[in-house]
Amino acid sequence: MITSSKKIVSAMLSTSLWIGVASAAYAETTNVEAEGYSTIGGTYQDGNPQPINIYSVNGVQAINFVNRGDFAEYDVSVSTAGEYSIEYLIGTSIASGSAVEISVLVDGNWQSAGSTNVPLGQWDNFQALAANNNISLAQGTNRIKITGAGTHDWQWNLDAFSLTLVTPENPDNPDNPDNPDDGNTGQPGTPFTIEMEAFDATGSDDPRAQGMVIGERGYPEDKHTVVDSNQTTDWVDYNINFPVSGNYRIEMLASGQTSHATAILFVDNVQINEVAVDTGNQAVFLDFELTDSTYISAGAHTIRVQSGSQINEFSWMWFGDALTFTPLDGGSTDGDADNDGVLDSVDTCPNTPAGAQVDANGCEIIVDNDTDNDGVDNSIDQCPNTPAGAQVDANGCEIVAVVDADNDGVEDSLDMCPNTPAGAPVNGQGCADSQLDADNDGVSDDIDQCPSTPAGSVVDGTGCIVVTPPADSDNDGVVDTLDMCPNTAAGLTVDSQGCALSQLDSDNDGVTDDIDQCANTPSGETANATGCSSSQEGGGTDPDTPQPGLLYGELAGAMNVSDTNPNWERTTDLLQTEDSVKGNTTEVYTGFIYDADGHISFYEHIDDSVRLYIDGVLVLSNDSWEASSQTTDLNLTPGTHEIELRIGNADGGSGAVDGIGFGIDVDGGTNFVHPSTLSESIFTSVGEETGNPDLEQEGDIIVELESFVFTSTNGRVGSDSVEGFSPTATGVNWVTNGDYGDYMVTFEEPGTYGAYITISAANDGSYGARVDVDGWPVAWGYFGGTGSWDVSSENLLYGGTFVVEQAGEKVVRVEAIGGSDWQWSGDRVRFTRLGDVTAIPSPIYNPDDHFVAEIQGPQTDVTYLKKPVEIPANKKVLKSDVWYTYPQNRELEGYDNFGATGAFWGHPPEHDFYDDTVIMDWAVDAVYAFQAEGYEYTARGEFDWGYGWFTEYTTNPQPHYVRTLDDRNVRMTFMGYLSHDGYNNNWLSNHSPAFVPFMKSQVDQILKANPDKLMFDTQTNSTRSTDMRDFGGDFSPYAMENFRVWLSKKYSTGELAALGINDINSFDYGDFLRAQGVTHTSWSNAGDTLSGNIPLQEDYIYFNRDVWNQKFAEVLDYIRQQQPDIEIGASTHLFESRGYVFNENLTFLSGELNLGARTTISELPTNILVHLKGAQAVDKTLVYFPYPWEFDELRLQDAPRFGRGWVAQAYAYGGLFSIPANVWVGGEVWTWSPGADNYRDIYLFVRAQADLLDDYTSYSKVGLVHAMYSSMKAGFIDGGNQIQSSTKLLTEGNINFDLLVFGDEGYPVVPRPEDFDKFDHIFFDGDEQYLTAEQQALLDQQGDKVRHIGQRGTVSGIEITVSISGTESNETVSAVSRIHETDAAAPYVVHLVNRPFAGGVTPTLNNVEVAIPQSYFPEVVTGATLHLPDGTSTSLTLSTNADGDVVLPVNNLEVWGILELAH
């Protein structure tokens, strides 16, 4: 029997032999894979169910079990009729009697071309074997039969065979067009077309214009690449070699909506004609006859088309697509042998060198005054060193091709505000302040003097809250906002809250304080007319006698289930369940409940946690604020039962969420009501009330908040015109987040203290306060509103350890914290002594335990990007991995069968991060449980969401925060207004000496859970504080100190002096800028795009990145020491170049990214592709998910299936897109599910095609130069306009490309020689201007491989052409080519991504053809299979078009398909 054995000659070697054959005179070769037969048959009985078998061997498929008389028939298409030679890739272990015969079916009869003996070799060692005879084939499809024709029972195994044209039927009349690169535009007598974007030069005769650029116009289904940004007098030139002399008609395909616009035609600087150009719509294209006839001689000529105006008005004009030249007569046969544009009959210098300028006699004109060969004389050339091949304007300066209709500096495809007023400065999305209203108060940002007005506020014309002077309606000396008793009678003495004794009842016994003789009547006891109860007059109640109501008290802890009820007081109505719960507090209700029939059920919907016990049995438990919970009918024994209810809150919001917080149905059903509404109380309890310890005690220290010695702010609330606290007669108001007051307070004795603050706040919100003593936080708390400015409440500041070790005067700071911008009006702070001095826990961070490395100097030498470290195959991120966004997503209904392999964002606990019990609970319950189900767990280290961890790590994080030029904290408002342990979510500075130890501490805690992979959300490291207009730089003391070191290593003393720095040891960059009048605002605006001439600003940007790279490298090295083989990811992207991490220990990229849904959902935008290309350039897989607003836009437009395109595009370009389960969209909606059924098939398709994804890499013949400095100036993290424009142009032309990355002056990386060698062509665009001189010289060494992107149309064989129903449709379907990284024999792959959407759904396409140039891949494509997400795989019939391209027919293409290509 035939068995497989190791192949000796590789398939790649065999194919290289075919290429040699294909380079013969006619070079038409058709390759046929043996397994691609149409039918098989045979006669020999070998026991095999089929006459012939298909098998796999050494990475290829072939046929075996071929016996004498067995045959396979093939349908083979050729474009030219004629004689073809035959070559087989064939092998046999039969010494003699093995032969192969080839026949062709002609008019129903088989005509044999003879047989060829197969020499002895090995079954699976396929060797090239030339047939003895040729075969005659007709143009089109031929039926060919290959037969086992020898005498032996066993014949041969066959891999493939090829047919090469030897003699065409009519070799004297070849129908192939001229090579488009040979200087001829077409054949004599035939029309030819020039694409107008392939201009040779452009410029303008008006100084207000700069010539035309390349852009796009048209409807989504009919896009045209055009010359764009065309203003009056702009022109484009084309150097054209006309094939014949004669009269030509010249037409222009164009659109335009300017009624007075014209197009002027010039031939060799002579005006021929002027015609009107107006189609009424930029998207409607028509042909305009520029001339019906003009004589042009054979040879080279310059054709110019210039825009004009019938009324001489300067304005936007037309958009030109193509020029068509039609010869009107047979043309002269007079030739032009030297191609100098002068016919041979009059050429007196017949051998002119190629490219030379000549006079009318054909003789060379010597020009020596154009040094850079850009066509502009040196005397007027303002840019004398223009790079070779660049397009230039009339001044000799390179043209940057960016489509920007409103001229605001933001390319149209990224412009969220397309009609910006002329000259207005804009942000990264193209919006001027006059087009924005950030706080939605109805006043545009350009005139809004209070840009952060709270929602719903009434504002004036400047956008600031309308404030009326404080009122005092009852004239008692206490303003209404603080007056707790607003109708005090005239003349009465009042307290600080505006209440007279006659208006107060402090013990709630029904007798006012002015006549109450027993001031502290116990709660629940009845008082007489003088305010005294029987127990106060000598009587009492038996504590063992059941009393109405439940005993109520409060305990420390988010859910304290171990400590007993402190029994502060009795509550009969349980209304406390409907109030807010203090932070880090558990409310406890204990006693008895009576139920007559035993049928009873309970309900809760409380933020955060609830536990309900009946007779000691837990019957209700819930830790979710989002979802309510309830019991069924408990079917108790009729009578009295013990009850215990515990309600806990960790932090932030609390209390009833929606409707009632705690409910009961005494009939055991679902008609729940609050207990306070029951006609009879069913609760009793036994025991004495201990009293509320939070009540004021004798000897307490009272701090009146209006008595501060200093006030200021750490925050930034734009609508607050008061810096710090605003004092009133009895308190403070105008308090916003970060405002603080300092007080001198004397503590008479040491001890442990508690702290309370009395505030009022009319609205619901997130309010809080922190108390510092001598610069150290001792107490903090969070609380809700009081419902009115007239109602105040005292709140316990429950957090911290408040210990005074020595008596005496202390500096006490009271600071407003919490989530809301506008905070509270404050009355006082009260300190009560609780006991003796207790031990103070030491902070986790001790600076003495850590070495801080000296800051390194700048990187100045040209260097290479570091390749990521090798990760073992079993631990790598795979291109076919399918990850949940969060591990818990797998538990959602419908999402358990997506073929998932792991999870993206495995969040460690948000609080108590350094409590090993909490960490190990996370390890067991989250990490190990997930891994036990066969998934990989990626644990996430944090920056922004780690703000709470950092507070726990340092206890006092304030010295380590980023500080702006005006000395404010930078709050990370993009993640929400959050606060933890007394500190808001402020930005941690990378410059802090605590930064590296903190990050290492994260690593230590996370690795205790043994996750499979690590990912750090590094995009919010503090380099971003220098990256966006909203934040404004890091001028913290630690940053200033590090900048001094960095500058001293970059500059000499003399150079520093020239910069205005005379003493580097005392230099403070913040003081330096402030002394020159630079403000926070001017710095921020300039820093956003590196404009505005701020001294040392670029140095400062580079310095921040250098320090960030140095410090994070320490962390990455620390990880590698502990886990050498672990994958480490980070949300660092090449196009956020200010914070990019140049480190080999990072092995994949991750994060949230912008996908452009708000721009359009009619087609897949290309802006994300720069990130995928960037990841490819640094050899790291990109794993990502969109920003919340992207899916929210799909929700608003009811287009959940649009995201399928995002997923398909990610995997097609080598990335991973995590499963969109319940996605966070923010706002009042919180989360939204786009539907499991809309995405399941896409992800199962990924897993099914793992062999075509894993270990595959991008394949292209074009490299695109990318200068990282362009991203520095972009103002957003998606790169600059030019790279976005170039990416769009190449993608929608189906020109696959990869990036050649050039760094900036701060980190001047360059491509390696092997990076350049990968590409046949290198394109550059306007961003070339950002290369350093050294980088430009390196690029220039690549010679004529380098050309401007505008010349892409002159290069053949670089694109895969997609057509639909015969119409080229590259902008509709992207054809993304990829090859295996290491296995040259593996199939090639082309991903087909269908880009348009209609109503959020991808239209299914039929009659699609994909044309792949024969020379595109390293080897010729010989077979194809189409794989679709519906589970089908279809073998495709290959054909060849007139250009020799392999053409593949594709049908039923929805959003994505994969072409598997044999070769």
Swiss-Prot record:
SUPFAM superfamilies linked: Galactose-binding domain-like, TSP type-3 repeat
Region (Disordered) residue spans: 166-191, 512-549
Alphabetical list of CDD domains matching this protein: CBM6_agarase-like
Keywords, in A-Z order: Calcium, Carbohydrate metabolism, Glycosidase, Hydrolase, Metal-binding, Polysaccharide degradation, Signal
Keyword Iron-sulfur annotated: no
PANTHER family: RE20510P, THROMBOSPONDIN
Listed EC numbers: 3.2.1.158
Taxon lineage: Bacteria, Pseudomonadati, Pseudomonadota, Gammaproteobacteria, Alteromonadales
Source organism (scientific name): Thalassotalea agarivorans
Catalysed reactions, semicolon-separated: Endohydrolysis of 1,3-alpha-L-galactosidic linkages in agarose, yielding agarotetraose as the major product
pH profile: Optimum pH is 8.5. Active between pH 4.5 and 9.5, stable between pH 6.5 and 10.5.
GO BP: cell adhesion; polysaccharide catabolic process
Extent of the signal sequence: 1-27
Reported function: Alpha-agarase. Hydrolyzes agarose, agarohexaose, neoagarohexaose and porphyran. Hydrolysis of porphyran by this enzyme improves its antioxidant activity. Does not hydrolyze kappa-carrageenan, iota-carrageenen or lambda-carrageenan.
Name of this protein: Alpha-agarase
Residues annotated as domain CBM6: 701-832
Subunit structure: Monomer.
